[in-house]
């Protein structure tokens, strides 16, 4: 109460921020007349003037009013669009490292040009992050005209680009790309063996478009680069035979009494977490079946250490058969299982689920099973985006997640007022008893809209639902277009024309996101088609464009008079934000519009979270079939259920981050070491430190610290030095001749002998020649052990929750054991590098070159690289990418063709590659 009174007196934090920003907007507006008088060249020259002022030490905040005014004037000339004052507010918010919530149709893409231009003046690069490649390419081309006019360069960062193309994209003043691609480039840059192979040039400033989708929806799944592991095809096929022989338990057992089970069975399903659990009976049934299949011994159990992998495969088969359904979670095309994005309904070709789930689905569908993957590098979006010096974002729906943005990323949300107040009528939900009644009511609403000419957008949560609506509309003979994964190449064009008279569009959730639905259709698209028509002369084009404008204006007014775009949704999503995004497609820029959700008690969200309460209301009211509940209490009940799901998903993301923070600290150390090694001119200090550490550990095994002579094993130390390290050191003789010798004296002699042996080796070939070999050995050892460490952390993470049963804190145990594992990693690198460099037999520079080339070949040989990344569903999905293999240096597999240093140069000069184009590297 007191808080509300204070807010009314002083205004909210958001109100105070906007008040401050409006003063800056007044200063920008005051410059408009002055800049209108400038010629194009004079306006463009302002960019270099600003760059010089920034280089001289002037703050960006001081330049902001002038820079924003320049962008507005440039946009008026090039884009024929003038930034509204509210877009200026959004731009200031983005420059200050905040999230700008701007409603659909308010021009977020144009708003971003303001802070992008300002921050690009530093010359350190600006990254604009979009949700998909289509939007990255579209926005880069669209806004690139403005940036180029103002004298800035623009690059597009897409998957499967060559190293040179990516370097050019990152070296531009402004780079457009997807969140996944930026993250993968960061990981790949920390896997290369040559400084010149890196593509990124530092993480200065990023603006994330659809920030809620990228930093919230996709943050439950890390980015993973992996390589193929051992083949388990037979195991997946065998486990697929086990699942049909198991039965589902009905009812939940009370953990205290064991009561509550109505029908015993082998497994239970938790739909909330999408997990399957074997019961005690299920374990016994599975063990019996596996014994009959010859996969385990008669007395063996699934908990035996030798059978841990069987458990992994069995649970993957259970999830594949019981939780993942064809045409809802995936489709089968050309003998392959292709994942469907549950949020957008798009097909995610080339991507794969991880943890053996994809292979289990392949076994279930009877298609060819492809191999599992081993993690080579990994990072979460939370930790990747926190690497940027400054981060900002924009979306139409951030306020519901404002707490999470602040808690996880330290990002404040600023709600920007709309340019025109929304006139959309968001009607109360209608809840029916059955799915059939729900669809009948929705179809009736669609028919009424069609008969009066009002355009309709029907939103569904899956391809399956969109196909049901499709079939029902076909039956009713209502013309319509379906926008789902099976034709996503045309989705932007379909969405653009969804606001025309009598048009019915079925869309799976947010398919076509980023494209405005304009009432009367998208005039710009029609004009573009005319301008691209080479068969028409200029006069004919102008006449046709004038005709199109007149027809569009007439249709635009007709649609407005009919009530604008009608949104009809057939299901509530888990997140209120996704529902708000669907509603936001209507009523843009002050246009009229309306929305209605048609629900049933059979919908997943209702069934799991809110069904009982609503069902009780229906029964009390004795609702007849076909009648719906339409009341505020029902809508509030559903939103309460959504809040529960959102809170659970937030906890999942926060827990993921807490565990990944441990790995992130270690990742920073490893990547910093790699970069130091690659950038260093000399590695003598690092190699000497590793060597001393290695021989200290070795010596202390035979001559413990602060020990007396009787505890020493000098003979054993001499033997190991000679046999394993080829160092002949007569310590026993010196011990007899010396009057007094301590354990420290012995250690010094061993280290000195090792240093001499190493110096002799280097002297034969020359330190300069040896440095590159040292660099390769160090990098390969770090990479190999880091990959093994990632696997170890993954296994540790999967089983750490069991420590809770021993009254231990799982997170603390994870931190402690991860720290111990990291110590083992550093010891392994130290010992391996020292061993290789001390024992390798090299007598000449030519032999050194051969050894280095062999190591490079081993490093760059790889059978497959796969990239696992999340989509808006938060599910892990993987794509195979052969085109970037040459940029990623990994061990094991089939060699990728490359030119050896001593091979003839491909240019045809007849010289060796190292003496010709190899010098360029």
Swiss-Prot record:
May bind 1 zinc ion per subunit. It catalyses: ATP + H2O + cellular proteinSide 1 = ADP + phosphate + cellular proteinSide 2. Gene3D superfamilies: Helical scaffold and wing domains of SecA, P-loop containing nucleotide triphosphate hydrolases, SecA, preprotein cross-linking domain. GO terms for cellular component: cell envelope Sec protein transport complex; cytosol; plasma membrane. One of its GO terms (biological process) is protein targeting. The keyword Translocase applies. GO terms for molecular function: ATP binding; metal ion binding; protein-exporting ATPase activity. It comes from the Bacteria. Belongs to the SecA family. This is Protein translocase subunit SecA. The lineage of its organism: Bacteria, Pseudomonadati, Pseudomonadota, Betaproteobacteria, Burkholderiales.
């Amino acid at each position: 109460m007191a808080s509300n009174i204070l807010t009314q007196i002083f205004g909210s934090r958001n109100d105070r921020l906007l008040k401050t920003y409006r003063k800056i907007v007044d200063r920008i507006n005051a410059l408009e007349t002055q800049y209108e008088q400038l010629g194009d060249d004079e306006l463009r020259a302002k960019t270099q003037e600003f760059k010089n002022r920034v280089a001289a030490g002037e703050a960006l905040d001081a330049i902001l009013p002038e820079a924003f005014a320049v962008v507005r004037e440039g946009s008026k000339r090039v884009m024929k669009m003038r930034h509204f004052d509210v877009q200026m507010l959004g731009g200031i918010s983005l420059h200050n490292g905040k999230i700008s919530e701007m409603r659909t149709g308010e021009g977020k893409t144009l708003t971003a040009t303001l802070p992008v231009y300002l921050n690009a003046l530093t010359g350190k690069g600006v990254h604009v992050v979009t949700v998909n490649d289509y939007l990255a390419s579209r926005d880069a081309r669209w806004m690139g005209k403005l940036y180029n006019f103002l004298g800035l360069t623009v690059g597009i960062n897409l998957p499967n680009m060559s190293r040179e193309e990516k370097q050019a994209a990152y070296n531009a003043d402004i780079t457009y790309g997807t969140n996944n691609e930026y993250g993968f480039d960061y990981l790949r840059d920390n896997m290369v063996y040559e400084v010149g192979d890196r593509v990124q040039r530092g993480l200065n400033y990023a603006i994330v478009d659809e920030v809620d989708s990228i930093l919230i929806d996709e943050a439950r799944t890390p980015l993973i680069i992996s390589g193929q592991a051992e083949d388990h095809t037979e195991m997946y096929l065998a486990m697929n035979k086990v699942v049909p022989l198991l039965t589902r338990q009905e009812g939940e057992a009370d953990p205290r009494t064991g009561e509550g089970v109505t029908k015993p069975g082998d497994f239970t399903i938790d739909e909330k977490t999408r997990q399957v659990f074997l019961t005690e009976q299920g374990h016994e049934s599975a063990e019996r079946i596996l014994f009959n299949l010859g996969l385990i011994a008669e007395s063996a159990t699934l908990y035996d250490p030798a059978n841990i992998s069987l458990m992994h495969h069995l649970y993957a088969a259970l999830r594949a058969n019981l939780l993942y359904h064809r045409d809802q979670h995936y489709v089968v095309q050309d003998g392959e299982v292709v994942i469907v994005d549950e949020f957008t309904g798009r097909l995610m070709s080339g991507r794969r689920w991880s943890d053996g789930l994809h292979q289990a689905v392949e076994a279930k569908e009877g298609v060819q099973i492809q191999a599992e993957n081993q993690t080579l590098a990994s990072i979460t979006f939370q930790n990747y985006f926190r690497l940027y010096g400054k981060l900002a974002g924009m979306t139409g729906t951030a306020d519901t997640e404002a707490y999470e943005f602040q808690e996880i990323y330290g990002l404040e949300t600023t709600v920007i007022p709309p340019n025109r107040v929304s006139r959309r009528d968001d009607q109360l939900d209608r809840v029916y008893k059955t799915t059939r009644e729900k669809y009948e009511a929705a179809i009736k609403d669609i028919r009424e809209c069609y008969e009066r000419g009002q355009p309709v957008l029907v939103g569904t949560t899956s391809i399956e639902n969109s196909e049901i609506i499709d079939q029902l509309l076909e039956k009713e003979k209502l013309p319509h277009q379906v926008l789902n994964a099976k034709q996503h190449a045309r989705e932007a064009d379909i969405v653009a024309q969804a606001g025309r008279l009598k048009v019915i569009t079925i869309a799976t959730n947010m398919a076509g996101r980023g494209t405005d639905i304009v009432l009367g259709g998208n005039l710009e698209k029609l004009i573009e088609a005319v301008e691209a028509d080479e068969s028409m002369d200029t006069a004919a084009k102008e006449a046709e464009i004038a005709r199109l404008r007149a027809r569009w204006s007439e249709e635009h007014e007709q649609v407005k008079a009919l009530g604008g775009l009608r949104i009809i949704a057939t299901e509530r999503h888990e997140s209120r934000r996704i529902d708000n995004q669907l509603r936001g497609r209507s009523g843009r820029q002050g246009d009229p519009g309306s929305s209605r959700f048609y629900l049933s008690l059979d919908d997943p969200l209702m069934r799991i979270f809110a069904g009982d309460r609503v069902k009780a209301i229906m029964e009390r009211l004795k609702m007849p079939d076909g009648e719906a509940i339409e009341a505020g209490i029902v809508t509030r009940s559903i939103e309460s259920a959504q809040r529960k799901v959102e809170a659970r998903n937030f906890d999942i993301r926060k827990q993921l981050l807490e565990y990944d923070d441990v790995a992130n600290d270690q990742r920073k150390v490893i990547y910093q070491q790699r970069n130091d090694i690659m950038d260093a001119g000399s590695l003598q200090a690092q190699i000497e430190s590793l060597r001393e550490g290695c021989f200290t550990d070795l010596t202390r095994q035979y001559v413990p610290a602060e020990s007396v002579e009787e505890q020493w094993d000098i003979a054993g130390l001499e033997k190991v030095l000679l046999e394993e390290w080829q160092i002949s050191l007569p310590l026993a003789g010196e011990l007899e001749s010396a009057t007094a010798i301590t354990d420290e004296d012995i250690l010094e002699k061993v280290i000195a002998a090792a240093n001499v042996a190493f110096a002799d080796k280097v002297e034969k070939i020359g330190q300069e020649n040896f440095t590159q070999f040292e660099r390769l050995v160090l990098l390969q050892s770090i990479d190999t052990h880091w990959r093994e460490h990632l696997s170890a952390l993954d296994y540790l993470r999967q089983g750490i929750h069991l420590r809770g049963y021993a009254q231990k804190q799982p997170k603390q145990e994870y931190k402690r054991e991860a720290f111990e594992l990291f110590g083992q990693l550093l010891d392994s690198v130290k010992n391996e590098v020292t061993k290789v460099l001390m024992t390798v037999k090299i007598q000449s520079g030519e032999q050194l070159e051969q050894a280095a080339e062999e190591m490079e070949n081993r490093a760059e040989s790889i059978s497959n690289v796969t990239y696992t990344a999340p989509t808006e569903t938060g599910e892990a999905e993987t794509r195979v990418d052969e085109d970037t293999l040459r940029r990623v240096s990994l061990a094991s597999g089939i060699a990728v063709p490359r030119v050896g240093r001593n091979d003839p140069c491909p240019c045809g000069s007849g010289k060796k590659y190292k003496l010709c184009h190899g010098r360029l590297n």
